[in-house]
Amino acid sequence: MPYHSSTKSRAVSTWLLVVAALVCAMIIIGGTTRLTDSGLSITEWKPISGAIPPLSQQDWQDEFALYQQTTEFQVQNSAMTLDEFEFIFWWEWGHRQLGRLIGLVYFVPFVFFWMRGHLSARLKSRLFGLFLLGGAQGAIGWWMVASGLSDRLDVSQYRLATHLGMAFVILGLSIWFSLEARHGPPPLRRGRLAGVTAGLLGLVFVQIILGAFVAGLDAGRIYNTWPLMNGDLIPEGYLGGMNFFPAIFESHAAVQMHHRWTGYLVALGVFAYAWQVWREPRVSLKPFMVILPALVIGQIALGIAALLAVVPLSLSLAHQAGAILLFIAMVAAAWTARRAV
């Protein structure tokens, strides 16, 4: 049966959507791991044997002893009990275990579809590249964790942003390739709004990365007022005593301010884009005229609520979930715009 058979393309498309759904779950669990300070509870990287959790009391004592050597424990959690350690351990273990599951869910069907001839040459190369990105993501995750096992209390915000950024790249490509598997590659001629949509997708991605810096620095726990930052448009401690270049990534005030203002810029861009889509004669992009503004309004509301409540876990995760939905919608819009000719 040829590649363009609807049965085979639907199967490949559905598989990639399952992978994308698992990546979404991975991002949410990763966010929970970060917000509960669970990320440093496993101090070793064992891709194979690490799949087996502690099975005896002695195993738990051994894992706890390793964690007790970290700066995070010695400075911040020295009163932690074994039961409390088990709580944070399970979050980090679950995060890593889901990563292993995603690897299996991706690799086994990938080999099957390849061997059965269900993939075009174009999709083979792209899906193999996506497989390599998944492997790199595991290494990036450990590289991030390792940054918190020295004299730091938390992992590096730079490495956290890299890890989250790669997760969204993998998510976006999974959805893009799923759409391509179902509908075929986009035409060589791009739609009129293709460039604008791609630019807006890039801006949303930048905003997500800025959110990672806010999370990495716990910058949402200060300036818990809105619309101003403790009464100021530009907070008094913007540079935090640093030069401009490191300050824009390391000053809590600067990082939060940039995340706020880029959010407003995303909203402005989305509403301008919706107006352009409204004027567009072709109907394929019309649903995004409603979907994108609704998601942006909801996301801004969640961000403000989380800030005013000093980033409780529930609102923070809802805000992260909103970012995932907005990103997915933007990927779908970008893909649709390339075909709207």
From Swiss-Prot:
Tagged with keyword Iron-sulfur: no
Entry binding sites for heme: 259, 319
Known catalytic reactions: Fe(II)-heme o + 2 A + H2O = Fe(II)-heme a + 2 AH2
Membrane topology: Multi-pass membrane protein
Cofactor(s) named in the record: heme b
GO molecular function: metal ion binding; oxidoreductase activity, acting on NAD(P)H, heme protein as acceptor
InterPro entries from the UniProt entry: COX15/CtaA_fam (IPR003780), HemeA_Synthase_type2 (IPR023754)
Cellular localization per UniProt: Cell membrane
Keywords: Cell membrane, Heme biosynthesis, Iron, Membrane, Metal-binding, Oxidoreductase, Transmembrane, Transmembrane helix
EC number: 1.17.99.9
Pathway in which the depicted protein is active: Porphyrin-containing compound metabolism; heme A biosynthesis; heme A from heme O: step 1/1
GO biological process entries: heme A biosynthetic process
Gene Ontology terms: cellular component: plasma membrane
Keyword Magnesium included in the entry's annotation: no
TM spans (from-to): 11-31, 101-121, 127-147, 160-180, 194-214, 261-278, 288-308, 315-335
Family to which this protein belongs: Belongs to the COX15/CtaA family. Type 2 subfamily.
Annotated function: Catalyzes the conversion of heme O to heme A by two successive hydroxylations of the methyl group at C8. The first hydroxylation forms heme I, the second hydroxylation results in an unstable dihydroxymethyl group, which spontaneously dehydrates, resulting in the formyl group of heme A.
UniProt subunit comment: Interacts with CtaB.
Protein name: Heme A synthase
